[in-house]
Amino acid sequence: MDTTKQNVKTLKNFINGKWVDAKTETFENVYNPATGDVLARVPHSTSEDVADAVTAAKEAFKIWQKVSIPKRAKILFKYQQLLVEHQEELGRIVTEENGKSLDEAVAEVGRGIENVEFAAGVPTLMMGDSLSSVATDVEATNYRYPIGVVGGITPFNFPMMVPCWMFPMAVATGNTFILKPSEKTPLTSQRLVELFQEAGLPDGVLNIVNGAVDVVNGILDHPDIKAISFVGSERVGEYVYKRGSDHLKRVQALTGAKNHTIVLADADLDAAVKGIISSSFGSAGERCMATSVLVLQDEIADKFMAKFTQAAKDIKIGNGLDKGVFLGPVIRKENQERTLNYIQTGVKEGAKLVLDGSAEAKKHDGYFVGPTIFEDVKTDMTIWHDEMFAPVLSVIRAKDLPQAVAIANTSELANGACLFTDSAASIRYFRENIDAGMLGINLGVPAPIAVFPFSGWKHSFFGTLHANGKDSVDFYTHKKVVTARYDQRRFK
């Protein structure tokens, strides 16, 4: 960690509508991972900073919860318009601090905007239910209400999209929000809050507290924070879930992944190659929906691998701002070194290294690893088991679909799985027997749109209610059921 002052911008926290200095003397650098250049310094804020944000959010909640739902929706609509106008700008910020290609970054911004659009439909989403006759002259009505101050802890890999899974719906449903963005990619969130303020969001409704573990613990422990949304690693997600639950908070923790993609003999191999190249190596493999294990049916494995390996070799690697670049860097030097160690481990444990991306580490100033492909991988190998979060693909062969599904189901991480096939019967078998929450058929990244939940299984999710879709409305609201008798005897 770099705690020295440099001639770069020092980021502030956003509390009660103002940019304020963190109460800390500890900072770390925000890097452009493609160049190693320092973009800014981010503070390691303290639990005192969290408390200040909670105080502001708690006061703002008293007023915000009373704002009419259509008026809140109008602010969301204005916010959506501003995000569309600034989509290219936001994409460049994402690329500069995260490293992914500009095309991917702009597309990510688009996915975030979709979540804002969904949240803007809050008048319909907040509607309750009623039954006019539960007994003689008695009716019952169910109403939704916001729960209060809520928090969000977001990862580095989608600095635009993941925060937009959280705060737009949270504030649309009447809550106030405290966001802790990743200390590796905090710049996008700064611009997001500026644009929301421009859209007319009142002071204190959305707050940002930058930092690391002290901020996480401050959010988890504060008694006035009622719910916490988290996206990140399995290890940290389990910690967040347990500690937050110990403090009687609602917690949704979306965590690690080891996604398997199966290609059967009847698949369109060219389409499968294209989809899996994007899934495995897009965003440098640093996404929880990446294909990290490829299971090939024996009879087409050699033919597929010839096509796939050549396509991987043709990938353009470099700074995501450069035209035509597909694969950018991993996020930090330590992530690069960790990935290189995994490649060495795979070789030592007996996997066949078909394509080695290690050489890219020496060709660039940033933190690059090229596309890497292993064959002859076994399910007891480290590279099969661990979530590497890198452009490294493990390939396994299977005689048929049941064996391929059995291999995938061995993993304790079950965010998603994909199948390439032309068989309706195979699709049904896959759907009914695979143990994963998000399934792709003839596509490589089965991340759902905003109206459906992001529904990981097993150790890929801790909690009850998922992010996105109707689950997010349920997560950020609680209900009152009013049962009323209206005596009708006077009219008889």
Curated annotation (Swiss-Prot):
<dbReference type="InterPro" id="IPR016161">
    <property type="entry name" value="Ald_DH/histidinol_DH"/>
</dbReference>
<comment type="similarity">
    <text>Belongs to the aldehyde dehydrogenase family. IolA subfamily.</text>
</comment>
<feature type="binding site">
    <location>
        <position position="255"/>
    </location>
    <ligand>
        <name>NAD(+)</name>
    </ligand>
</feature>
<feature type="active site" description="Nucleophile">
    <location>
        <position position="288"/>
    </location>
</feature>
<feature type="binding site">
    <location>
        <position position="387"/>
    </location>
    <ligand>
        <name>NAD(+)</name>
    </ligand>
</feature>
<dbReference type="GO" id="GO:0018478">
    <property type="term" value="F:malonate-semialdehyde dehydrogenase (acetylating) activity"/>
</dbReference>
<feature type="binding site">
    <location>
        <position position="233"/>
    </location>
    <ligand>
        <name>NAD(+)</name>
    </ligand>
</feature>
<dbReference type="InterPro" id="IPR010061">
    <property type="entry name" value="MeMal-semiAld_DH"/>
</dbReference>
<dbReference type="InterPro" id="IPR016163">
    <property type="entry name" value="Ald_DH_C"/>
</dbReference>
<comment type="function">
    <text>Catalyzes the oxidation of malonate semialdehyde (MSA) and methylmalonate semialdehyde (MMSA) into acetyl-CoA and propanoyl-CoA, respectively. Is involved in a myo-inositol catabolic pathway. Bicarbonate, and not CO2, is the end-product of the enzymatic reaction.</text>
</comment>
<comment type="pathway">
    <text>Polyol metabolism; myo-inositol degradation into acetyl-CoA; acetyl-CoA from myo-inositol: step 7/7.</text>
</comment>
<keyword id="KW-0560">Oxidoreductase</keyword>
<feature type="binding site">
    <location>
        <position position="180"/>
    </location>
    <ligand>
        <name>NAD(+)</name>
    </ligand>
</feature>
<dbReference type="Pfam" id="PF00171">
    <property type="entry name" value="Aldedh"/>
</dbReference>
<dbReference type="GO" id="GO:0004491">
    <property type="term" value="F:methylmalonate-semialdehyde dehydrogenase (acylating, NAD) activity"/>
</dbReference>
<dbReference type="GO" id="GO:0006210">
    <property type="term" value="P:thymine catabolic process"/>
</dbReference>
<feature type="binding site">
    <location>
        <position position="183"/>
    </location>
    <ligand>
        <name>NAD(+)</name>
    </ligand>
</feature>
<comment type="subunit">
    <text>Homotetramer.</text>
</comment>
<dbReference type="GO" id="GO:0006574">
    <property type="term" value="P:valine catabolic process"/>
</dbReference>
<keyword id="KW-0520">NAD</keyword>
<dbReference type="InterPro" id="IPR016160">
    <property type="entry name" value="Ald_DH_CS_CYS"/>
</dbReference>
<dbReference type="GO" id="GO:0019310">
    <property type="term" value="P:inositol catabolic process"/>
</dbReference>
<dbReference type="InterPro" id="IPR015590">
    <property type="entry name" value="Aldehyde_DH_dom"/>
</dbReference>
<feature type="binding site">
    <location>
        <position position="156"/>
    </location>
    <ligand>
        <name>NAD(+)</name>
    </ligand>
</feature>
<feature type="binding site">
    <location>
        <position position="184"/>
    </location>
    <ligand>
        <name>NAD(+)</name>
    </ligand>
</feature>
<dbReference type="InterPro" id="IPR016162">
    <property type="entry name" value="Ald_DH_N"/>
</dbReference>
<dbReference type="InterPro" id="IPR023510">
    <property type="entry name" value="MSDH_GmP_bac"/>
</dbReference>
<protein>
    <recommendedName>
        <fullName>Malonate-semialdehyde dehydrogenase</fullName>
        <ecNumber>1.2.1.27</ecNumber>
    </recommendedName>
</protein>
